[in-house]
Amino acid sequence: MVSVEEIRQAQRAEGPATVMAIGTATPPNCVDQSTYPDYYFRITNSEHMTELKEKFKRMCDKSMIKKRYMYLNEEILKENPSVCAYMAPSLDARQDMVVMEVPKLGKEAATKAIKEWGQPKSKITHLIFCTTSGVDMPGADYQLTKLLGLRPSVKRYMMYQQGCFAGGTVLRLAKDLAENNKGARVLVVCSEITAVTFRGPTDTHLDSLVGQALFGDGAAAVIVGSDPLPVEKPLFQLVWTAQTILPDSEGAIDGHLREVGLTFHLLKDVPGLISKNIEKALVEAFQPLGISDYNSIFWIAHPGGPAILDQVEAKLGLKPEKMEATRHVLSEYGNMSSACVLFILDQMRKKSIENGLGTTGEGLDWGVLFGFGPGLTVETVVLRSVTV
């Protein structure tokens, strides 16, 4: 008879969790940021609000975003006028969209990740699904299991309403699952669709308007597992993780699910709160490794907006190229909430290989991934690149 201790030992993986594949997807509808203010004020019947439109134009100009992808197009919005109003009861219409579309977009990203991984989907043991777009039972994790044809015994974990830090959360959870379940292969999917937060403009809540200038739709998927087989090709090791709530940050970023959809609230000092506390998080993460030069590591930071990135750079004295992959994703896709950091991870390994930089992390060994979001919550993931 085996002992509990022997069972426990047999469950543990030998080595650290690794990211083995990454896939991303966006809806087909692409919006150009330079023409978006005209479109947005026209489609929401708000063209009479000329001063507010000028403000919104300035927000879009300063956003450092070139384009975004959105499930909501003109046709869908014309069929759902309640979604275009600032505060009209519209939750049912929004739910009908996202309950269908969030798993579908997730499937597109997951299919790409599974293809790159190169193993049969029957080898997936765990599924983590994360979205801030809609809530339903059974959840998007169940819908995706059906859409992909995963085994009914796959162990599912559904994360709703986490917000922009959750790209870090899913990696932290996937690491714990992979390292504590020998042979586990975890499919992680973040799928975000702004149909829950889209609404017309108002001059009483400019933070709502900031969201309309920044948010985009996208889904990203990764396969995480320890002890890779010879046929599996790890991209990054997940070395260490942490989550913390920043001091004096209550109410800095809030979202509330109401009859009018998901409302978004933002305090102006979010970039200040993050930049003030970022060094503490880095010291905790990198002191054990003997690293104190933060220009010597590669960077993946959730691009909440350009002001956050600017202030973090200034506070730490980072060279402009450190945030290159992060700024590229912000520019090409906008803020896709939880999916962003996984898009950046994908961008980084692709550019590193294209440019012949020697490792998946821009030629460097060590890196950091940060998620920032409601709370204010900060997720920190220490990554180790692999040689290419």
UniProtKB/Swiss-Prot annotation:
Active site annotation, chain numbering: 164
Associated pathway: Secondary metabolite biosynthesis; flavonoid biosynthesis
Reactions listed under catalytic activity: (E)-4-coumaroyl-CoA + 3 malonyl-CoA + 3 H(+) = 2',4,4',6'-tetrahydroxychalcone + 3 CO2 + 4 CoA
GO MF assignments: acyltransferase activity, transferring groups other than amino-acyl groups; naringenin-chalcone synthase activity
PROSITE patterns: CHALCONE_SYNTH (PS00441)
Keyword Thylakoid: no
GO BP field: flavonoid biosynthetic process; polyketide biosynthetic process
Keywords recorded for this protein, A-Z: Acyltransferase, Flavonoid biosynthesis, Transferase
Record EC number: 2.3.1.74
Function: The primary product of this enzyme is 4,2',4',6'-tetrahydroxychalcone (also termed naringenin-chalcone or chalcone) which can under specific conditions spontaneously isomerize into naringenin.
Similarity remark: Belongs to the thiolase-like superfamily. Chalcone/stilbene synthases family.
Protein name, as recorded: Chalcone synthase 5
Gene: CHS5
